[in-house]
Amino acid sequence: FPYITGQYGGAAFVLLYLLFLVILGLPVMVMEFAVGRASQKSSALAFDTLQPSRRWHWFSWWGFIGCLILMMFYTTVGGWMLSYVVKMGTGAFNGLDAAGSAEVFGAMLANPGELIGWMLAVCVIGFLVCSMGLQKGVERITKVMMTCLLLVMVVLVVRSLTLPGAQAGIEFYLIPDFGKLFAGETASEQWATFGNAVYAAMGQAFFTLSLGISAMEVFGSYIGKDRSLTGEAVRICGLDTGVALLAGLIIFPACFAFGVNPGEG
């Protein structure tokens, strides 16, 4: 989210993203929850149960494949994060500027053994958590980890906002500049930029909530009938968006404080 926000001009893109989150992300999440709760089946079998005579259930297998692809993405990035935790703990980034940090990242990407090793570590941790079940494993551990995440992010926000030169990053992130959504010398280039921004905002709304790949059907199958699906979706969207906005308050002030291009990712 912060990377795409920096690429498309900061606060103006944030408003565009929030719009699609409300008009697309939230309704689609409620619908996916409804499919899961009504069928009480996995994402691969939910449509067969609800509409056995229709051919729309073929989509469920594509969604299942999408979940596998998404898992490949998250296990890879999760491996990067574990590697960075070790590097930070051993002082690998001490005294490095932006170019030096980029070299460390490039060296990690050039080392297949390191990448595969950390990815496998993430997979093992994930399997261990899932083996404990949804409520005793995923739910219980997620509550602890999310609390720790929010506490760490609050500390980082305070630190980032107190850096010299952080004011420029705050303005970039929180003050909309709609002209950046139409960047370009000609009218066609300007509308192309706006179209790309709209597409990115729409895609981010789906990506950040893991929509369209049947993942939410799985969680929906565990939601009791005494719970409001809309209420659950609103809380999830609110928490997800809050974390994304906090990440922006960490990254953009730090980027401007250290002279790093906020659109570099």
Residue ranges of model-derived segments:
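N-terminal signal-anchor module of multipass membrane proteins
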Residues: 1-14, 19-23
